[in-house]
Amino acid sequence: MATQTVDDSSKSGPRRTVVGDLLKPLNSEYGKVAPGWGTTPLMGVAMSLFAIFLCIILEIYNSSILLDGISSN
């Protein structure tokens, strides 16, 4: 016969670690959504500032903005 049965007593459960015990409270809120907008406006502000930063970097790269004393190849 090609199949083999294994006793449940020989299997061990998941191993507990210190890191796992520290991170478990973070996972306890999984799937729960706070009512309302929450931190959405803050994320919008952060994304806007990051987009402005990327535009400035792009303009410097394209030499649209010239910086005194800095030459680009």
From Swiss-Prot:
Phosphorylation is a light-dependent reaction catalyzed by a membrane-bound kinase; phosphorylation occurs on Thr residue(s) in the N-terminus of the protein. The modification Phosphothreonine is found at T3, T5. GO terms for biological process: photosynthesis; protein stabilization. The gene is psbH. HAMAP family: PSII_PsbH. The keyword Thylakoid applies. This is Photosystem II reaction center protein H. It is a single-pass membrane protein. PSII is composed of 1 copy each of membrane proteins PsbA, PsbB, PsbC, PsbD, PsbE, PsbF, PsbH, PsbI, PsbJ, PsbK, PsbL, PsbM, PsbT, PsbX, PsbY, PsbZ, Psb30/Ycf12, at least 3 peripheral proteins of the oxygen-evolving complex and a large number of cofactors. It forms dimeric complexes. GO terms for molecular function: phosphate ion binding. It is found in: Plastid, Chloroplast thylakoid membrane. One of the components of the core complex of photosystem II (PSII), required for its stability and/or assembly. PSII is a light-driven water:plastoquinone oxidoreductase that uses light energy to abstract electrons from H(2)O, generating O(2) and a proton gradient subsequently used for ATP formation. It consists of a core antenna complex that captures photons, and an electron transfer chain that converts photonic excitation into a charge separation. GO terms for cellular component: chloroplast thylakoid membrane; photosystem II. It holds the Pfam family PsbH. The lineage of its organism: Eukaryota, Viridiplantae, Streptophyta, Embryophyta, Tracheophyta. Keywords: Chloroplast, Membrane, Phosphoprotein, Photosynthesis, Photosystem II, Plastid, Thylakoid, Transmembrane, Transmembrane helix. Belongs to the PsbH family. The chain crosses the membrane at residues 41-61. The keyword Transcription regulation does not apply.
